[in-house]
Amino acid sequence: MLQEKLTMNRDFLNLINESLLNKYHPAQSRLHEAINYSLSAGGKRIRPLLVLTTLDSLGGNAHDGLPFGIALEMIHTYSLIHDDLPAMDNDDYRRGKLTNHKRFDEATAILAGDALLTDAFQCILNTQLNAEIKLSLINLLSTASGSNGMVYGQMLDMQGEHKTLTLNELERIHIHKTGELIRAAIVSAGIIMNFNDAQIEQLNIIGKNVGLMFQIKDDILDVEGSFENIGKTVGSDLNNDKSTYVSLLGLEASKQLLNDKLTETYDALKTLQPINDNLKTLITYIVERNK
C-alpha cells in the first residue's frame, strides 16, 4: 500500500533526476565525469523529494522548490564523496558502487566534492524567485551545511569514534550531520511560500524529527539490512567502533524511539493542515524503508 502511494512522487523523482544528470557532462572533463559518477549512483533523493513534496502537500508550487532541492542533493553528494575518503570513513563502496576515490583517485574525489559544494549555491541564484527569498534560502543552506551544521556534525562524528557516547551526544551529532540538510529541505517550503514564524517553527520541528528518524533507521539497517539493499557493508558502523542508536539503546528500544518520533511528527504536520497526504506518506517511507 505504501509503495502504491509513493508512485505519486514518481514524477517528482523523474524531474529531480533529469535536472541533476543534465548538469554535468562526463565527456567535457575528468572532473565532470567524477561528479556525474556520484550524482548518478542511484541515491534515494530524499532531500529534494522532501522539498517538492512539502510544497505540494502545503498547497505550494512544487516546481518552485526544484532548484533548492537540486542544491541540497549536490551538497549531500559532495559530503558523501568526502566522507568516504581514507582520511575520514575510508569506505570502498557507496550505493553499491565503488566510492569516488576508488573509481578515480583521491585528488579528483576531493575536487569533485569541492565543485558540487560551490555549484550548489548557483542553483539557487539562477531561480526565478524574488531576491528576498533567494537570500533566505542561501542563508538556510549555508547554515545547514557549514561549520554550524552538517560539517560540524561530521567533525563531532569523527571525534566520537572509539568512544562510548551518551544519547545526548549521539543526538547532537546526528541533528547536525544528517538532520540539518533534511530540516532545511522541509523548512525551505515555508520560506518559498512566505509562511509566518509560527508555521516555520512547526516545519522546523518536523524537519528535526525527520532528520533524527532517518538516522535511527539507518542505524537499524546497519544491523538488519543487507549489502544488496543498503549498498554498503553491513555493520560498518560497528566495525569502525562508532556509537549508534542501536549500540546505545538496543534494537527494540531504537525501533520504539523511531515510532515515538513518528507520532510527534504526524502531530506537528496536522497543525499545518496539509491539502494531501503526500508528505506524510514520504515520511512514513523514510521510517519503513529497507535501504
Curated annotation (Swiss-Prot):
<feature type="binding site">
    <location>
        <position position="177"/>
    </location>
    <ligand>
        <name>(2E)-geranyl diphosphate</name>
    </ligand>
</feature>
<dbReference type="GO" id="GO:0008299">
    <property type="term" value="P:isoprenoid biosynthetic process"/>
</dbReference>
<dbReference type="InterPro" id="IPR053378">
    <property type="entry name" value="Prenyl_diphosphate_synthase"/>
</dbReference>
<feature type="binding site">
    <location>
        <position position="47"/>
    </location>
    <ligand>
        <name>isopentenyl diphosphate</name>
    </ligand>
</feature>
<feature type="binding site">
    <location>
        <position position="178"/>
    </location>
    <ligand>
        <name>(2E)-geranyl diphosphate</name>
    </ligand>
</feature>
<feature type="binding site">
    <location>
        <position position="94"/>
    </location>
    <ligand>
        <name>(2E)-geranyl diphosphate</name>
    </ligand>
</feature>
<feature type="binding site">
    <location>
        <position position="89"/>
    </location>
    <ligand>
        <name>Mg(2+) 1</name>
    </ligand>
</feature>
<feature type="binding site">
    <location>
        <position position="83"/>
    </location>
    <ligand>
        <name>Mg(2+) 1</name>
    </ligand>
</feature>
<dbReference type="GO" id="GO:0046872">
    <property type="term" value="F:metal ion binding"/>
</dbReference>
<keyword id="KW-0414">Isoprene biosynthesis</keyword>
<keyword id="KW-0808">Transferase</keyword>
<feature type="binding site">
    <location>
        <position position="83"/>
    </location>
    <ligand>
        <name>Mg(2+) 2</name>
    </ligand>
</feature>
<feature type="binding site">
    <location>
        <position position="89"/>
    </location>
    <ligand>
        <name>Mg(2+) 2</name>
    </ligand>
</feature>
<keyword id="KW-0460">Magnesium</keyword>
<dbReference type="InterPro" id="IPR008949">
    <property type="entry name" value="Isoprenoid_synthase_dom_sf"/>
</dbReference>
<comment type="similarity">
    <text>Belongs to the FPP/GGPP synthase family.</text>
</comment>
<dbReference type="InterPro" id="IPR000092">
    <property type="entry name" value="Polyprenyl_synt"/>
</dbReference>
<feature type="binding site">
    <location>
        <position position="76"/>
    </location>
    <ligand>
        <name>isopentenyl diphosphate</name>
    </ligand>
</feature>
<feature type="binding site">
    <location>
        <position position="232"/>
    </location>
    <ligand>
        <name>(2E)-geranyl diphosphate</name>
    </ligand>
</feature>
<keyword id="KW-0963">Cytoplasm</keyword>
<dbReference type="GO" id="GO:0005737">
    <property type="term" value="C:cytoplasm"/>
</dbReference>
<feature type="binding site">
    <location>
        <position position="44"/>
    </location>
    <ligand>
        <name>isopentenyl diphosphate</name>
    </ligand>
</feature>
<dbReference type="InterPro" id="IPR033749">
    <property type="entry name" value="Polyprenyl_synt_CS"/>
</dbReference>
<protein>
    <recommendedName>
        <fullName>Farnesyl diphosphate synthase</fullName>
        <ecNumber>2.5.1.10</ecNumber>
    </recommendedName>
</protein>
<feature type="binding site">
    <location>
        <position position="215"/>
    </location>
    <ligand>
        <name>(2E)-geranyl diphosphate</name>
    </ligand>
</feature>
<keyword id="KW-0479">Metal-binding</keyword>
<feature type="binding site">
    <location>
        <position position="95"/>
    </location>
    <ligand>
        <name>isopentenyl diphosphate</name>
    </ligand>
</feature>
<dbReference type="GO" id="GO:0004337">
    <property type="term" value="F:(2E,6E)-farnesyl diphosphate synthase activity"/>
</dbReference>
<dbReference type="Pfam" id="PF00348">
    <property type="entry name" value="polyprenyl_synt"/>
</dbReference>
